[in-house]
Amino acid sequence: MKLISLLFKQISVVILIDSISTLPSDTEKLCYNSVIVLKLSWSLTLHIQIFMEVWQYGKFQWNDPFFNNDMDDVFNQLFRRMDNQNSEVRGISLMDNRCHRMSLLNTEQLASYPKIIKQWKYLKMVNRLLKKEGFIEKLGTNLTEQARDGLLDPVIDRENEIQKPAQKFCRRRKKNPLLVGESGVGKTAVVEGLAQRIVAGKVPETIQDKEIYSIDLSSLEAGTQYRGSFEENIKQLVEEVKAAGNIILFIDEIHQILGTGALAGEEVKGLADIIKPLLCHVAKLSVIGATTQDEYRNTILKNAALARRFNDVVINEPTAADTLRILQGIKELYEKHHHVVLPDDEKKAAVDYSIKYIHNRHLPDKAIDLIDDCGSFSGKNSQTDVETLDQRLKNKRQLRRPAIKSEDFAKAADIKRVDRGTKQKIKKTHQKEKITATIDDVAQSVERLTGIPVSDMGANDIEHLKNLDKRLKVMVIGEDEAVKMVAKAIRRNRAGFSEGDQPKGSFLFVGPTGVGKTELSQALALDMFGNENALFGIDMSEYADRTAVSKLIGTSAGYVGYEDNANTLTERVRRNPYSVILLDEIEKADPQVLTLLLQVMDDGRLTDGQGSVIDFRNTIIIMTSNAGFGNEALSGDKQRVQSLMDKLAPFFAQNFRPEFRNRLDNIVEFSHLTKQDLSQIVDLMLADVQKTLAKKSIKLEVTKAAKDWLMEQGYDEAMGARPLRRVIEQQIRDKVTDFYLDHLDVKNLKADLVDAEIVISAA
């Protein structure tokens, strides 16, 4: 009786105003015997369905003596009154069907009873209200129920992955599939897809009546501050699962069960210890779990007793073509949410960009994130009137609930009609305002997510590549041939005509000191990646020892510093895959370090000390060397015209093996600087001084005589431009500093040559 009362107390929340109908005599007697007065006007069909569900819950869940076997005859008689012509479905035993299934009526009969279809969502809401009394409803979410309500996203093109766990549930014992795969490959989506297939009946007969519940481990552990509370929760959960007989528990991040409920330093059983015996028994407990490859290896496999109770199902990353089909299947959800149109080329760009630029995540998750971010960016300028209509709709719904509770159904019906009109206005407004997302929006989404300046290969980018050498020549003086060789290699790679998976470029810069090898590297980083911080240099003199290899890839397992690899080459590339790597003075490194670089230059990847594969395909690797360009290179004209390979032959024979030389894109020779080159370098260095002074609103004018004197003092063919930098530091920066400290109010300065000395004065 309590159950019947509870039903009619709760049903007032979900009542659907309908035509008044007369109850059959059997039903009237049943209601009056239950001391329930039906004041609500429902259709006959709704009454029959509700009483059928009450009977099933009362008989199987609560064992109420009111619900006896004679009720079968009552309901069969009621169904015959509904449709005397077709009674095939009446013979279906109500005891063999769960209250949540519509299998009592076939498709033709559903078409004959449109009110059943219209009111079915309200019946399901009643079921949920009844089942909320159960402990399992407090711990998790019924994915199968969500699938019936259409609350789950469609699962596209994952049939093989869904059928594998479905087949595992057909076993007699150990019906516990464990989904193992990297994060983002769709493990949870496979479980949701299984729930959808159960609702659609596209699973083996053994599991067609199953309910999948996603369990929240934190809810299971919450409030268990007293000894035995946690075990009591587990016991109650297991008892409900056994009593239902058709529940599958889904535990995401299932490796956490090894620590859930266990107290440090105390002999208390955890969740894994308690459910472990139940997992291998017949018809005791069915669990489907999900975890990553690393967690599976480090936790589950180490517990052999737990591992043998699961059947692992590997979920691999979908291909680019599969991901594109997934995006095609879910695009309507994101178009509706963001009020934008997502064309096919935009989805194709999302897949391509996610593969090319987002390396530490997996498909399809990263491609879906790009679509979502792109949609939010494209539809960010929503009109205010849409928000006003949404707010009006919410306010009307709030007024509708009190009207239903007070049984003012006329007012509730009026509010519902207003709701329909408001929804139509919102729909029309959205249709007018829909914006079409573009490939540029996807590129901007990639830039927001990764910080990488991404642009499509359009006209602007082509011009940018064509003029690369011109821009570099402005910043690197006197090395036109070197700049030209580097620009050719970069253009070839960016245009997509390079073969293999090599880095964007791998160069060996050779030449005397101070001629611009490092300067060209900095200019290249600024031009290619828009930031000088994209260049990180490594002084290879620190790698003269063979054991220093760990500084590049991290310490191996079992050695000190295994967990701390933040400053290694591989970690820095993982965090910033678009960068210029400068290996300065490569000839000073141990040959073992050079051997390590072979894989980088050939395959564009390197495995670090922890076993992770780092992608180097988007880096530019530059090695510098002074070998063959010492002071002896200036001793005579014969050596001046000596070929590059002749100069490098002794060095290569000693340090570089043939396979290393063959993997270089180019060996770039830098020549000695002339006085004419140095005159242009003076202007560049003085421009840097001007930038520094501009921070204090100071302007400096340098006369031609002063520039010529600085060039003469700083010229050294053997040493390059570095002596000139020291001269400017001493003669300009230091003297400007002294003058500024004595004359704080002077903002316009002048540097002139007086008696063979630089003098700073007010302009």
From Swiss-Prot:
Q: Which domain of life is it from?
A: Bacteria
Q: Which Pfam families does the protein's record reference?
A: AAA (PF00004), AAA_2 (PF07724), AAA_lid_9 (PF17871), ClpB_D2-small (PF10431)
Q: Which SUPFAM superfamilies has this protein been placed in?
A: P-loop containing nucleoside triphosphate hydrolases
Task: Give the residue ranges for region: II.
Answer: 437-629
What are the GO BP annotations of this UniProt entry?
cellular response to heat
Q: Which residues bind ATP?
A: 181-188, 511-518
Annotated region described as I, given as residue ranges? 136-386
> Which InterPro entries does the annotation name?
AAA+_ATPase, ATPase_AAA_core, Clp_ATPase_C, ClpA/B, ClpA/B_CS2, ClpA/ClpB_AAA_lid, ClpA_ClpB, P-loop_NTPase
Alphabetic keyword roster: ATP-binding, Chaperone, Nucleotide-binding, Plasmid, Repeat
For this protein, what is any one GO molecular function term? ATP hydrolysis activity
Annotated Gene Ontology cellular component terms: cytoplasm
The record describes the protein's role as: Could be the ATP-dependent specificity component of an ATP-dependent protease.
Q: Family, per the entry?
A: Belongs to the ClpA/ClpB family.
Mind telling me what this protein is named?
ATP-dependent Clp protease ATP-binding subunit ClpL
Q: Which gene is the coding source of this polypeptide chain?
A: clpL
